[in-house]
Amino acid sequence: MGLPEVMPASVLRGQLLLFVLLLLGPQISQGLVITPPGPEFVLNISSTFVLTCSSSAPVMWEQMSQVPWQEAAMNQDGTFSSVLTLTNVTGGDTGEYFCVYNNSLGPELSERKRIYIFVPDPTMGFLPMDSEDLFIFVTDVTETTIPCRVTDPQLEVTLHEKKVDIPLHVPYDHQRGFIGTFEDKTYICKTTIGDREVDSDTYYVYSLQVSSINVSVNAVQTVVRQGESITIRCIVMGNDVVNFQWTYPRMKSGRLVEPVTDYLFGVPSRIGSILHIPTAELSDSGTYTCNVSVSVNDHGDEKAINVTVIENGYVRLLETLEDVQIAELHRSRTLQVVFEAYPTPSVLWFKDNRTLGDSSAGELVLSTRNVSETRYVSELTLVRVKVSEAGYYTMRAFHADDQVQLSFKLQVNVPVRVLELSESHPANGEQILRCRGRGMPQPNVTWSTCRDLKRCPRKLSPTPLGNSSKEESQLETNVTFWEEDQEYEVVSTLRLRHVDQPLSVRCMLQNSMGRDSQEVTVVPHSLPFKVVVISAILALVVLTVISLIILIMLWQRKPRYEIRWKVIESVSSDGHEYIYVDPVQLPYDSTWELPRDQLVLGRTLGSGAFGQVVEATAHGLSHSQATMKVAVKMLKSTARSSEKQALMSELKIMSHLGPHLNVVNLLGACTKGGPIYIITEYCRYGDLVDYLHRNKHTFLQRHSNKHCPPSTELYSNALPVGLSLPSHLNLTGESDGGYMDMSKDESVDYVPMLDMKGHIKYADIESSSYMAPYDNYVPSAPERTYRATLINDSPVLSYTDLVGFSYQVANGMEFLASKNCVHRDLAARNVLICEGKLVKICDFGLARDIMRDSNYISKGSTFLPLKWMAPESIFNSLYTTLSDVWSFGILLWEIFTLGGTPYPELPMNDQFYNAIKRGYRMAQPAHASDEIYEIMQKCWEEKFETRPPFSQLVLLLERLLGEGYKKKYQQVDEEFLRSDHPAILRSQARLPGLHSLRSPLDTSSVLYTAVQPNETDNDYIIPLPDPKPDAADEGLLEGSPSLASSTLNEVNTSSTISCDSPLELQEEPQAEPEAQLEQPQDSGCPGPLAEAEDSFL
């Protein structure tokens, strides 16, 4: 006997409701009835009022979602009623009352009726509100209600902003309040009871941005093992107030999980709900649903996600690979294995049972990436596959719960290549051809022949060769697989029994990677060796031609002689375009000619790559002296025509320059009947660098006392004022002395001039040695006849001498700058020392082997003195008188280091160039005063426009000298200008007003301004008629009086203007010498150089 089945209470309630509806269905249709009827009632305070609600079904009264005390009954006629008695009513009883069906009958009966009751209460103007009802949230732009309700419907109510006392015109309903569209502000309601004004509570209106619900649900892991945690996030974007409701498997068993709400403020804002189960069970597998709804409206959305709880982890292959994988040689190959696993596995790759890892050279790359939650892709990438990488590979993925592995063989296909094709000639007359090649996969061998294999494909196919039934050929092929190299080797041997004419035979190997072939020509044994002989002859001819080409190129790259100095004729208005005097077109004044029979050549003073300087004795140059020792510039017999033209250009320029005390002056020239000779002054003590080296010990002994700094020494002349020296300041006397520290060319053979014209004389001139001490010099008898003032005849090198050398060089450079002359090689090696410590500026590049001189760096067809060059000259090929100022600063450094080499700490490479670009400057020399070093620094200004001109440098150095030295220098200069020096006499013949040209201490006439091209500038070159040259040198002396200057091209500027003497100004009338003094001389051009040699950087 079974027990009765127990039914749930909800089922019994539903059956009861169905039974009541079936019985009372017709009566329910009559609806709810309220007694007394009416939409609203106004009750007196403290009165009693009874309300009855009746219907065919059980009913009840509600007020503000609350159920007041009431009396329910079932009438005799079968209807139901509920009586609500309001006793001793007050203003607080004002409000809505609803008659509804009893909730126990279910939601099917949702009808209700409403009645509103007012209880006017003088003490209560407005009904009290709960605090949460004072905050009114508005979504979008919709109407809303401010519920300031009164107890008396007869009262007049107004609405105000709290901060403004002006009433708002908004409709008012006594039962509901003010209805309208409101801004986000604070509002208050006002009414008047009797003579008393009553204010309501303050209402706050807020607008909420409620966008469409966009829900996203994600889980940290959708697959978890039992015992691990489950975390699911439900996120809503852009909504401020939402409600979350979760549905998940545990709810069926009544085990609830409390979600956690997470607010992430930002733009846009995010609100999230997190459902966390710390310990997952197998029963937690299933669907997790997140339902989101907006609090202020009925919008909503929901999303679901499936979570799987497993007992143990797993690893499963999703794709398999073929057992043999193919890779091509020297091409990258990626091998990919796809599998699924949880938790994350470890992955290893093996080759031939050896573990693989990433190659440091990047030739092998291993990677495993997670493409989804449980899906993985592991890749093996071989970069530029090699033959050695062929073999057996295995991928193994594993973790503590499971593992899986996949193996395959990698075959590297190698293109076929013919390694060897040889022939042999056995004694039996056969021709044996052996072809050996390799490849992977196995290559096939094909032999073919033709009279000319290159033409065969055009007309007919080559004839295949193989085993012949006529026994004309026999073929044998052997195939071997090399395990180490993982490729096949094929050796094929072809025997040709009868070859009576030349044949071209091809061996071709082919596989899936391509083909390769070689050809060989098979000739009969009787073929002559004519081809071999012809080939050898052709090879010798080709080698001879190549050797000649190389020799010609080396000859053309040999550096050419060029004069360094340039004379600027005019500058463009913007300072970036220059026009230089073209020395080729200048005329030559024949008054400088000296007959060759009046010149006796002596020993070589200096020899260079292009020419030499020879000591000589000249007759008839001076009225006061029968003979004069001079220096003669000449080219070597191997000089090219361009170098002869450069020397002639130098002579033409020098013939138009005026004399100066501190410049090596031109005395004469020989241009007819033989080589070109330029005759200049002779300086017995050589160049300044060597002079400083020879006399350094006297300076150091003099200044060994540290308490007596050089800058404090007092200058005094050791000789009395009346002591004289030979005419022309003994510059041309027959005295001993050295010349320049240059390489002596003792092997120079002089071509006797008598062989050419029969007029030149040679003599053994007394040898001079500048190694002799300064004080050992004893003037000869003729020299003692004429004595003049000496600047200094002391044998000891003093600090004043160093400053005096600097001062004299600055005076000479000031003179050159006033003639718009740019030196471009100002250095101590180009400054000579004469008697009385007089210095003269020169350019003896002709007599210096610059190709072996470390001070000159080769660039194309020229050599450049980089250590003395300004930055704009090094990097931009810009040469101006202000770039000479930079070189003057380097010369000062040489003087006060007693002949030191500039930049001793910098090698001549990129380090030197980078240091100059960064603004590196040499340190103060040990023997230089602060004033001298300050002058150096001014000369080394980065911007050449800010460097001082030579006129200013003369004044700066003059301040450092004593009055005695300046008087002696001025006296020597005046005596020089009044003497019968050949340079003075010949210049006076052309320019009568020479003595009034310049005072040695007057520097105001030199102005460093741009020379504007005008007719006056062009007029200073006087087109004098040239002497008729001999046929041998006719081309060098040609110079037409066309334009006095031209913009120089590369050919014209290859020889710069030598400033052994400065350029002379145009002759002016004898009656106006003072006007010439007042006219300022332009000093050069600070703008960029428009031409000249290319920058060597």
Curated annotation (Swiss-Prot):
It catalyses: L-tyrosyl-[protein] + ATP = O-phospho-L-tyrosyl-[protein] + ADP + H(+). Glycans are attached at N44, N88, N102, N214, N291, N306, N353, N370, N444, N467, N478. It holds the Pfam family PK_Tyr_Ser-Thr. Residues 599-961 form the Protein kinase domain. Keywords: ATP-binding, Cell membrane, Chemotaxis, Cytoplasmic vesicle, Developmental protein, Disulfide bond, Glycoprotein, Immunoglobulin domain, Kinase, Lysosome, Membrane, Nucleotide-binding, Phosphoprotein, Receptor, Repeat, Signal, Transferase, Transmembrane, Transmembrane helix, Tyrosine-protein kinase, Ubl conjugation. The modification Phosphotyrosine is found at residues 561, 578, 580, 685, 715, 739, 750, 762, 770, 774, 777, 856, 933, 969, 1008, 1020. The keyword Kinase applies. N-glycosylated. Ubiquitinated. After autophosphorylation, the receptor is polyubiquitinated, leading to its degradation. The active site is at D825. Residues 1042-1059 have a biased composition (Polar residues). Residues 1-31 form the signal peptide. SMART domains: IG, IGc2, TyrKc. The chain crosses the membrane at residues 532-552. CDD domains: Ig. PROSITE patterns: IG_LIKE, PROTEIN_KINASE_ATP, PROTEIN_KINASE_DOM, PROTEIN_KINASE_TYR, RECEPTOR_TYR_KIN_III. Residues 1016-1097 are annotated as: Disordered. ATP binds at L605, G606, S607, G608, A609, F610, G611, Q612, V613, K633. GO terms for molecular function: ATP binding; enzyme binding; GTPase activator activity; kinase activity; phosphatidylinositol 3-kinase binding; phospholipase C activator activity; platelet-derived growth factor beta-receptor activity; platelet-derived growth factor binding. Its main location: membrane. Interacts with homodimeric PDGFB and PDGFD, and with heterodimers formed by PDGFA and PDGFB. May also interact with homodimeric PDGFC. Monomer in the absence of bound ligand. Interaction with homodimeric PDGFB, heterodimers formed by PDGFA and PDGFB or homodimeric PDGFD, leads to receptor dimerization, where both PDGFRA homodimers and heterodimers with PDGFRB are observed. Interacts with SH2B2/APS. Interacts directly (tyrosine phosphorylated) with SHB. Interacts (tyrosine phosphorylated) with PIK3R1 and RASA1. Interacts (tyrosine phosphorylated) with CBL. This is Platelet-derived growth factor receptor beta. It comes from Rattus norvegicus (Rat). The gene is Pdgfrb.
